[in-house]
Amino acid sequence: ICACLVGLGDVYKRQILNNMAKNRDSYVKNPEKDFTRKRKLSFQDTINTIVTYDAGSIGRCIKRYIPKVEKTPTTSAFLQQQKKLKLSAFQTLFYRFNDPFPDKTLYHLHILSVDGTGVTVPMDRINENKEYARVRTNKDCTRPAYQFHVSCIYDLINERYCDAYIEPFRTHSETHVFSMMLERKNFPQKALFIADRGYESYLLMAQIQHDGNYFLIRAREDFGQGSMIKGYPFPRDGTFDKTVTYIYTKTQNKRTKANPELYKRVATRNSPYFINKEHPYVKMTLRFVMIVLPNGQKECLITNLPANKFPPETLKKLYCIRWKIETSFRLIKYSANLLEFHSKKIEFLQQEIWAKMIFYNFTTTITQHLRYKRDRGKYQYKPNMTNALQMCKDYLRNAKTPNDVEGHILMEMTPIRDGRSFKRDKSRHQSVFTTFRHN
């Protein structure tokens, strides 16, 4: 891990950040003036300080990154430097950091998941922030919660974020954003996309198949109004594994009515990958699988994976892996201190979200290369991610050596206990305002 940490730090600091600093005109708002003079905070230090933010105030974070008194800038000076940065600086660093590392696969496929999460942010109650306000159902609570909706593509095997899109909560559309991210192709090809309910869209399925990829999407298991399996000749009771081929169209005429076994009418918007004016009829093959969970509940999965290679039990195991993206949201929000923002400005808030994903990917890349094996015992073990995140943060601050980081990560390992399930409690989350931070 020491060699990996040194190499990873070299890629992050020297190769990527230094190259961006040399070509900083694309990442600053005023190329003729910004970061041209020699100051206490360079282009690299400004970005790295934001990447290593913790739950403390900005002043405390600066002092932890630059502990020497004569070199420590004031909070005001730091914010002036941060204001010079474009959001594209963090996005470019995020994408470039993912490029040089090899990817692990499962069944010769890159197993990816797509999902979104709400991120509560501190904002002033003004009209400009109205689209970020989330309406409260509690009548006693008068203050609205302000949220970003962050949609992500997450590599479940390599445990890192591949792409993300940030939008206001009120206007967010997960299917539209997923389609945009599919067009950007900032993820490894020959991929299997696993998604929860809400992504069962003919447009998305056609777009994924058009790119030569696969999907495994959970849909509503009932045959009620709005269910995708409504209208298909599937048994209402028990389980099934049916592969069907239809010609999908928005047209309703004598031919489509006379041949319901060949044509299926769907209500959908035009898409270059599905039904449009040039192609009013689109032939597509889908596989519908109804499975039963250990608690007796039924779940419907829609996929284009071949039945001879991926039986229902394999699909069930694959879908269970999807929970890793939910775990990553918990880790990045609470263990990596994403929810402890340091500004109310939309631009700075978005910078912090991208910075936390960069930091999360840095840490998981380190833990993926960690080799730890116990000959005795009931369980396999993995690094404690909360501890690993803190150790890697100290390393990026130059506060720990690679040997120290490795030793401290190995000191705190957690057992891998598969198959556990707990009730998912829902709670109301408040943003943490910067007024209540400790220096």
List the predicted regions and their residue ranges:
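DNA-recognition alpha helix
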Residues: S57-K71
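Long, charge-rich C-terminal accessory regions
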Residues: T137-K139
